[in-house]
Amino acid sequence: MKIRIGHGFDVHKFGAARPLILCGVEVPYETGLIAHSDGDVVLHAISDAILGALALGDIGKHFPDTDTAYKGADSRVLLRHCYALARAKGFVLGNLDVTIIAQAPKMAPHIEAMRQILAADLTSELDDINVKATTTEQLGFTGRKEGIAVEAVVLMTRKHD
């Protein structure tokens, strides 16, 4: 069995007059995130982790913000595309661990819905998907409620024939 680990990180700033979408879930908050796509910072970090595990670059390479085709793009579609690239190379998700770093809004009420969506989009068992959230104790840009940061780690496996 071949095993690959990928790490993804992304940050987006609050300020867009649109819904806050995280893992495909609309999270009630006063503002959304500024981005070329729908701004789903969690799915961007996960997509980067998958691409990184397979040495396929990053989401900026695959979905450049200079391409109008991705203006307002649904990040779930982008994530499924990244996972399809992994599947085409014979890899499947072993597990996913995500940390959402935000002072606000509170994520706890939305974590299970996020896990359900990720399990469906990554054709994985719910037990293979972990999403957690933390604050920075009011320190830094996330502590000042200026934006959200996310770290994602994936383990990808391929069985040899």
UniProtKB/Swiss-Prot annotation:
Q: Provide the binding site for 4-CDP-2-C-methyl-D-erythritol 2-phosphate.
A: 10-12, 36-37, 58-60, 63-67, 102-108, 134-137, 141, 144
Q: Which GO terms describe its molecular function?
A: 2-C-methyl-D-erythritol 2,4-cyclodiphosphate synthase activity; metal ion binding
Q: Keywords, A to Z?
A: Isoprene biosynthesis, Lyase, Metal-binding
Q: How is the cofactor bound?
A: Binds 1 divalent metal cation per subunit.
Which cofactor is recorded for it? Answer: a divalent metal cation
**UniProt keyword Transit peptide, yes or no:** no
Pathway this chain belongs to: Isoprenoid biosynthesis; isopentenyl diphosphate biosynthesis via DXP pathway; isopentenyl diphosphate from 1-deoxy-D-xylulose 5-phosphate: step 4/6
Q: Which GO terms describe its biological process?
A: isopentenyl diphosphate biosynthetic process, methylerythritol 4-phosphate pathway; terpenoid biosynthetic process
User: Catalyses which reaction?
Assistant: 4-CDP-2-C-methyl-D-erythritol 2-phosphate = 2-C-methyl-D-erythritol 2,4-cyclic diphosphate + CMP
Q: Where is this site: Transition state stabilizer?
A: 36, 135
**Residues reported in the UniProt entry to bind a divalent metal cation:** 10, 12, 44
Give the EC number: 4.6.1.12
Q: How does it assemble?
A: Homotrimer.
Tell me, what does this protein do in biology? Answer: Involved in the biosynthesis of isopentenyl diphosphate (IPP) and dimethylallyl diphosphate (DMAPP), two major building blocks of isoprenoid compounds. Catalyzes the conversion of 4-diphosphocytidyl-2-C-methyl-D-erythritol 2-phosphate (CDP-ME2P) to 2-C-methyl-D-erythritol 2,4-cyclodiphosphate (ME-CPP) with a corresponding release of cytidine 5-monophosphate (CMP).
Q: Which family does it belong to?
A: Belongs to the IspF family.
Q: What is this protein called?
A: 2-C-methyl-D-erythritol 2,4-cyclodiphosphate synthase
* Protein's gene: ispF
